[in-house]
Each structure stands twice: as C-alpha cells, then as structure tokens.
Amino acid sequence: MEDFVRQCFNPMIVELAEKAMKEYGEDPKIETNKFAAICTHLEVCFMYSDFHFIDERGESIIVESGDPNALLKHRFEIIEGRDRTMAWTVVNSICNTTGVEKPKFLPDLYDYRENRFIEIGVTRREVHIYYLEKANKIKSEKTHIHIFSFTGEEMATKADYTLDEESRARIKTRLFTIRQEMASRGLWDSFRQSERGEETIEERFEITGTMRRLADQSLPPNFSSLENFRAYVDGFEPNGCIEGKLSQMSKEVNARIEPFLKTTPRPLRLPDGPPCSQRSKFLLMDALKLSIEDPSHEGEGIPLYDAIKCMKTFFGWKEPNIVKPHEKGINLNYLLAWKQVLAELQDIENEEKIPKTKNMKKTSQLKWALGENMAPEKVDFEDCKDVGDLKQYDSDEPEPRSLASWIQSEFNKACELTDSSWIELDEIGEDVAPIEHIASMRRNYFTAEVSHCRATEYIMKGVYINTALLNASCAAMDDFQLIPMISKCRTKEGRRKTNLYGFIIKGRSHLRNDTDVVNYVSMEFSLTDPRLEPHKWEKYCVLEIGDMLLRTAIGQVSRPMFLYMRTNGTSKIKMKWGMEMRRCLLQSLQQIESMIEAESSVKEKDMTKEFFENKSETWPIGESPKGVEEGSIGKVCRTLLAKSVFNSLYASPQLEGFSAESRKLLLIVQALRDNLEPGTFDLGGLYEAIEECLINDPWVLLNASWFNSFLTHALK
C-alpha cells in the first residue's frame, strides 16, 4: 500500500500527508491505510479549489488554462494541509476580516464567494452515515459539509453542492480510479474496512448455549429469533420519519414529534405557599465562631479541651431567654438543655483532670429533645402477619413552600472570600506521575482561588461535624455525648486558629443499617436576630444568651448573641458522605480543568498560566434576571465550588429528581440554541416530572428559579 500511495499521488501531497501523520505520532509505513486516506482527502481538497476563481466583478469563474494578465482571486482558501498553527492563523484572519463565526474545529476550505467554511469528507462507507458523524462532531450551523464516497455518491448540507456538476464529476472520477487501482492490487478490501474498524468480531462470533437462550428470551415483543431482530435493526433506516418508525416498533406507541421552537418552552411553575425554611445540618452564613489564636493550651487538639478554651474567650454570657419559640416543640426544654450544657461544662472545669469526652446526664429535657423512648415498639412480623388491618402509617403530603430570598443570600455568601485559609495545599491529593506537573500547577492555582472561600469553610466544618458524630455514634452508642462543633483555619498572617460554632448532643445510636437514624440536638452561636426572617427559622427555637462587643468603624458596639437550637437527625450513610465533602473541591477543580482544556485545545498549548493570571478576562458565571453574570476566574472557581458544596449540604430526593429531569430540558434548549432543530414528544410529561420535584426544598427552588432565568435569556 505504501508503494501504491507514493506512485499514485503527487509528491507534494505525499509529503504533506507524512508531515500530518508525524505531527500526531503516527507512522506512514505502519498505518498505510490511514496514509492513503489522508492523501486522498488532501487531493480532493485541492481538486475542489482548482480552477475556481473570482473575477474583478466578484463573479465566480472557472479558468483552466492560466491567463497571466487576468486579475483573478482564488475562490477557495485551502486550510487543510497546513500545519496546525498556520491553519489556525489563516482561520483567525478570515474570521477577523469577514466577521464569520470562528469554527471549533479546523475546517478544510474557506469559500470567498459563499462566505463560509467547508468541511470535506471522503468516505468508504455510506455518505449519510459519515455526514451525520461529521455534523455531530462539528455541531456548527455555519460550516458547510460536503461528503464524497468512492462509489460516486455525495451529500452536502441542505443539498447545496457549492461546485458545478463538472468539477464534482472530476473528483468522483478520480476517487473511482483510486478505488479501481487499489482493487487491482488487492488493497481495496483492507482499505475499505479500515475506516470503520469494520468486520466486528460479532459478525463471525457464534453465540451459543446459555447466552443464546438469554438473547432469545430478551428480544422485544414480535421477534422470533436473534437473527430476525438483527436483520430488522440492520435494515432500520435512520432517515425515515420517527413517528412511522415508532408505530412500526410497537402498536401502543403513538408519539407525535413536535418541533421545539423558541416559543415552545414555558417557565417552570414554582410552588406557592409560605416561604421555605432553612434545613441545613448546621448554620451557614448566620454562624458565629468563638475563636482562639495560636492555641497552645494543655490538651490542644482534644475537642472538649479546645471547646472549653474557646468558651472562656467570651465574657458576655447572660441569663438565657427564648426570643423565637419553635411552633411545635416544648420550648422550655430547649432552654433547660442549654442551661444544662453550661452547668455541665462548669462541672468539668471543677474536676481535677478534664475528661476527653463528656456524656450528658439523661435529663427529661434531653430525653424529650432526643426522642428517647419515642420510637414505636418493634414487633416481629411473625407475630402480626395475621392481623387483618395491618397497614403502613399514613404520612402527610409535604406542604408546598415558595422560594424565599434568604437562600440566594446564602449562596452569594458561600461564594465570598473570608479572611482565613481553610485548606492547606495538600487537601486535594499528591502527585504520583510525571504528567502531573501541569495537574499540580492547576491544583495550586485553584487552591489559591478557593482556600479562603466561605464554601471551603463549610466543607471543613461539615467534615469535622460528621466525623465527630459518626465516631461518637459508634463509640458511645447509649450515651448522650456532648460534641463540640469545631473548625481550624489559618489567619492572613499564617497563625493557627481554632473555632467553636456551638455544640451537638447526640441521642442513642444503635446504627445497624446505613439508613438507621441517630437523633441529635444542635445549639449554635449566632448574631442574626431570628425575628428578621422568622420563616427561615421555622424549625428552630432561638435563645438570647449573651451580649457581644464588636469592633466597628464607629468604635465598639454591643450586639445580642443568640443560640439557634433544633432537634435533627442523620444516618450512617449521610455521615459517610458528609465526611467526604472534600470531594466538592475535586469536582469543581475538574469543571475548571475542562474549561482550561477547551481553551488549550484551541490555542494548542497549555493555557493554565494565562487562564489564572490574565486578570482582565471575565467568564460567564450564571444567569440571573439581569442577564448573564460574568466574573473573574477566581469568582468562577468559587461559584462552582459553592454549587457543589450546596448540592452536598442540601442533598435530597427533590434535588436528585430536579437535576436529572431538568437536564433533559436543558439539553433540548441547548440544541435549539445550536440550531439543531430539536423535536420532542410529551413535553408536558417532562415538565410534570421536573415540577413534581419543586415542593419545599430551598436549594431546589433556587435552582428552578435560576433555570427560569436561563430559559428567558437562552430564548431571546
């Protein structure tokens, strides 16, 4: 084959093909079929442009014998065959001078008469299959596709063949000749099959025995055998009308494919009702920390010791009182529980040696708060299977809730920078291979952008709380253990800092299954007055427990300090995921990496440095009612991280359903934006599936409202 290529093609074409293959690390001596294919493609591109000119009047003309005096301009710019850098330079300059949209992939030609890029394809298979592959790959309405086959067939975008009949006939004749020359040397079959990696094993592979029986059993209805089904699938023409095919497949299906136009989609309907309430496992933007810098006390690192040390930094404690009762709870019990914590911490200090853990006395208020003896008695199924009216509890439908503004504020806060660093460089893992110097560079840049982010604080807080709670649940199953909520960070000056957010008291925790629940009471410090947004704090009982002096621009001011208390519960599986919240860093890093990769493949060099250091460039972050929001690369990193963290903090079945179903609608809208003329059936059913997930979850409702903003802007 190699000899044939060198005899059959012009030496210039052969040289260009060798160069192209070497650029991709391929050897023309080994991959001879590929060598022949590249030469053929190059020759077709050159023949396409040969003899076609534009005269001084701008008309397209064909000139076969050169008149040296004519002022003629080549009609086609040849891009194929140039090295990649040069090719992109040509494409960029064409785009700059003509205003044509820049293609994502290098095209083969540019047509100055029709003002469009052309992608030429030469296939040994059926033209329409190859055409669809090309169209799917380049996904651009602007680039014109023209496919030729060795059998004389052709296919072009909108059946617009660009060239006159004669020029195309010349190309087809040449392809036919190449095919005959190959066939006469016994090279054609191997060449023809190499395009598809054809002759799949399956064709010669006999399925026998159990596999054969399973195959026959799992056929769709109305097919008697595997052969019968296979023949049907092979003959299934993809370009027929879909409705007909569907009815052919099953008598029950009658889908009408409706075109999806800019006017088709409507906004998602968000539920009405009282505003939604906070449901995270710990306070986010409203949390307050009692902190010690450069901790060096005895027992530093033992949570209880650290907590007592942090509590001692505050001098404004006062007699607690309830400022926002919990609607359904016995609020006095919350008050008594906090007083009990203060008293028992005081007792610890009076002991000679402070213990490492503290189990609370099982008082009536804690038993109430932790649901002790509240679980219905379990009865063996054998003893009750004869009971006639055995049934599951009736559970109430959840009450629909409307979107409240606090959840957007929470998200905005999560994207902000704090004045402390919450992760060290190695939180994302170490290098293990040489390729990873680029990876570590990206990781270090990314870490620098997110280490001070509030979402990162939430990650470390979540990891700490879940780890401590899971440990205590396994180690002290019957005890009401007091668990401090702690995090560690570094100040701007690099000093270590230990923070106390409040406490958790866990209930009995005999967790056999992943989903068995452990109850706990959380009590968290805050400066937020709950009376400002009472709907947000529906599930909480809030006490006022002290006054804090704050330094402000106008000097010291005293602010009331609140304690947010609620009963809550979690399970082994939820704690396991909570302990792995650092994965959010990895997920958002990967999203940023794919942005860098896209940029690098266009520029054909690694763009990591430019990506993070070009401070002037802005990137799309998301859609708001105002339009597409843009920001620095750091802001993009922090926003992606915050989204990932909120997906973890507010994980729920509603979120799972909304993400899966709304993604389908998103893909349809994106297809419309890319002018792919999408069609849909049962769009109403899709809307129903999305909207049945919009019930009362704040994070899901916020995502739905973002989705509506996206719809508005995408369809303008």
From Swiss-Prot:
GO terms for biological process: cap snatching; DNA-templated transcription; symbiont-mediated suppression of host gene expression; symbiont-mediated suppression of host mRNA transcription via inhibition of RNA polymerase II activity; viral RNA genome replication; viral translational frameshifting. Mn(2+) 1 binds at residues 41, 108, 119-120. Its EC number is 3.1.-.-. It is an enzyme of class 3 (hydrolase). This is Polymerase acidic protein. Its cofactor is Mn(2+). The keyword Manganese applies. Mn(2+) 2 binds at residues 80, 108. Disulfide bonds: none annotated. Pfam families: Flu_PA. A motif (Nuclear localization signal 2 (NLS2)) lies at residues 184-247. It is found in: Host cytoplasm; Host nucleus. It comes from Influenza A virus (strain A/Chicken/Scotland/1959 H5N1). Gene3D superfamilies: Influenza RNA-dependent RNA polymerase subunit PA, endonuclease domain. Keywords: Cap snatching, Endonuclease, Eukaryotic host gene expression shutoff by virus, Eukaryotic host transcription shutoff by virus, Host cytoplasm, Host gene expression shutoff by virus, Host nucleus, Host-virus interaction, Hydrolase, Inhibition of host RNA polymerase II by virus, Manganese, Metal-binding, Nuclease, Phosphoprotein. Plays an essential role in viral RNA transcription and replication by forming the heterotrimeric polymerase complex together with PB1 and PB2 subunits. The complex transcribes viral mRNAs by using a unique mechanism called cap-snatching. It consists in the hijacking and cleavage of host capped pre-mRNAs. These short capped RNAs are then used as primers for viral mRNAs. The PB2 subunit is responsible for the binding of the 5' cap of cellular pre-mRNAs which are subsequently cleaved after 10-13 nucleotides by the PA subunit that carries the endonuclease activity. The gene is PA. Binds 2 manganese ions per subunit. GO terms for molecular function: endonuclease activity; metal ion binding; RNA binding. Belongs to the influenza viruses PA family. InterPro entries: INFV_PA (IPR037534), PA/PA-X (IPR001009), PA/PA-X_sf (IPR038372). Phosphorylated on serines and threonines by host kinases, including human casein kinase II. A motif (Nuclear localization signal 1 (NLS1)) lies at residues 124-139. GO terms for cellular component: host cell cytoplasm; host cell nucleus.
